């Protein structure tokens, strides 16, 4: 009776559980547009990563399967499909086995075959030693702050061999799979890894969306050669609008040297590039390219003024980051109003007085100047 009840429960879970594909759109953020990603459900299925990281599902023809390394459909005998791995239910009967796809998923085995698949509750992982779900988090370098994102156990199972790709945690990091082994590196200086071009470049303000703007601790810091006395600075961080740097003496060194000290504005404030310190984020004139979506939290879409001299441009934000590469723009004769969350008709001069992104200024390095208003 107990066994029948267990099998009935598993059957119900199987009916209620859709086959768990990994979050393909999320991993498309790490690769170039046009990259082909394998399915974790069928060897014949794969996805094309398109603009804005939207995957398009495709299926190989008869008697062929997708091979991630050749980026195409090949005869079954020539493929490197991870679903051809040893059966996790081999030699198992009436028990559970961990999934090879994600740490919070499991299989139920009967007579050495998989008869059901399932997922643990949010906040839990499957513990093979206990044959049950326990509270915990996946131990993965590719974990993300979004609670609905479960990383694949081995990212090299889905990434093309020998090709560079980005990192979810740090915008300066790059990764590459060499015969199934993950290799990591970091871009030099203040460069970040641009997944669109597959190389290290100066950040244009859109390259770090996949990491919520997170870079290494000094990723947006000014060059150390600019810190030679306590009179230097403060200078803004190039990537995080709320961060700035103060040049202070390094008391641990002989002879006397100076180093930048990373400092953060209070919550809700940005650092002003004209040296006026921290103030309400809307009023500050920030370094062009820093993340103005910072402080927009939650899954609700929100729009903020992008730096522009005519106040027409706006960025689309969610969870503290831009979700589109290109900024939107109001029609001629309109300006974007953050408080109203839409484009208003008329002159923006009064609005610009208390909204720094609309004030006409430009920066050459850290030398910023104002210009006559564009009305």
Swiss-Prot record:
Disulfide bridges in this chain: 60-73, 120-133, 187-200, 265-278, 330-343
Chain ranges of the Chitin-binding type-2 domain: 25-83, 86-143, 153-210, 224-292, 294-360
- GO molecular function list: chitin binding
- Lineage, top-rank taxon, reads Eukaryota
What residue intervals traverse the membrane? none
- Please list which residues make up the signal peptide: 1-20
Q: Which keywords accompany this UniProt record?
A: Chitin-binding, Disulfide bond, Glycoprotein, Repeat, Signal
How this protein is processed and modified after translation, per its record?
A: Glycosylated.
- GO CC entries: extracellular region
Expression sites by tissue: Cardia and midgut peritrophic membrane.
User: Which Pfam families would you find in this protein's record?
Assistant: CBM_14 (PF01607)
**Listed SUPFAM superfamilies:** Invertebrate chitin-binding proteins
Q: Which residues are glycosylated?
A: 117, 360
The record describes the protein's role as:
May bind chitin or related oligosaccharide structures.
According to UniProt, the name of this protein is Peritrophin-48
What organism does the record attribute this protein to? Lucilia cuprina
